[in-house]
């Protein structure tokens, strides 16, 4: 009750002082005032201190720049008053009960330095691409970029951007064809990558394989990932996910409505034949995938049209770095390999006749990096006629990054009739 009375009294004093009262006194007490603000008190209540801010600043500590209408750089030091996302939805206050359960909120010890407080203004405390905020959409709490423009652009956004559309093979980051040894990456680098998990009876979920989004409702993967557990109800699919066991901003979760395994799939001692599968995905709300910066389709090649041997291509997944590793890495990883000719891959010291014309071989020329256990079903993506194209599906190989033992991939260009016959939506495919 005393605290409430003190606050009410403080409000009265502040209003009085703003109307011309000369009862304010600067005090040496530390109010953590920023931007030239001074710590003051009223002579009648000297134990109550607050920040007296310069004209263009506001907030408890003068931390809000009321004149700032754009952000510089990535907006890490933006302290303006933008408070809606790019769709015009209001941001949640950083001190709201929902936000207090997240990583960044007003009660952090470094909240003042990060610009967080008892307000809902957009900030960028973790050095993302631009200022963002938390937005409540139904029962979901989303991290959304804000409706505030870059000072370098010289203009304000007059309205929310047009609805995004799927454009196969397009990503926000440029292709990286000079990686040696692989590197950890984010989903923006491979926005078509799908992470496939299997449910267990006890309720736990484990990662199974990768896949690629070829149309809003269809993910392509490898049959050998599902052959032992072919029930569609056993699987869930995530798009837009950068980490194996934790959520990523903007990710989408899907049930598997239909699981199609190639009827002519077979496995020898080492090789997998016709190793291709299709998963029709649907969210609990009945929707297919929605395009975003982190979710995009990959282009399919034209019939029997593959890049030249020696072409550098990207592979992505949560696979192990070595076949002896016990755990999968937590962060998505990407590496670059080069396509190897069939003639070379069919040499006896490679794989001999186990490699067929429905397969492709690819490896790091130094044999330092490769697809490995856990990468199965994931994409081998090459630039073809200016578009990132799904050239192969991770299938099999001996060990990981062993000399003369390249990774072997399902040759997607040889399976287009099969893909079309089962999806029955050729116009929706990323051709």
From Swiss-Prot:
The record marks 177-178 as: Cleavage. Residues 27-63 form the EGF-like domain. It catalyses: Specific cleavage of Arg-|-Val bond in plasminogen to form plasmin. The active site is at residues 224, 275, 376. Residues 152-177 are annotated as: Connecting peptide. It is found in: Secreted. Residues 70-151 form the Kringle domain. Glycans are attached at residues 38, 322. Residues 179-424 form the Peptidase S1 domain. Phosphorylation of Ser-158 and Ser-323 abolishes proadhesive ability but does not interfere with receptor binding. Expressed in the prostate gland and prostate cancers. Residues 34-57 are annotated as: Binds urokinase plasminogen activator surface receptor. It is linked to Quebec platelet disorder: An autosomal dominant bleeding disorder due to a gain-of-function defect in fibrinolysis. Although affected individuals do not exhibit systemic fibrinolysis, they show delayed onset bleeding after challenge, such as surgery. The hallmark of the disorder is markedly increased PLAU levels within platelets, which causes intraplatelet plasmin generation and secondary degradation of alpha-granule proteins. Found in high and low molecular mass forms. Each consists of two chains, A and B. The high molecular mass form contains a long chain A which is cleaved to yield a short chain A. Forms heterodimer with SERPINA5. Binds LRP1B; binding is followed by internalization and degradation. Interacts with MRC2. Interacts with PLAUR. In complex with SERPINE1, interacts with PLAUR/uPAR. Interacts with SORL1 and LRP1, either alone or in complex with SERPINE1; these interactions are abolished in the presence of LRPAP1/RAP. The ternary complex composed of PLAUR-PLAU-PAI1 also interacts with SORLA. This is Urokinase-type plasminogen activator.
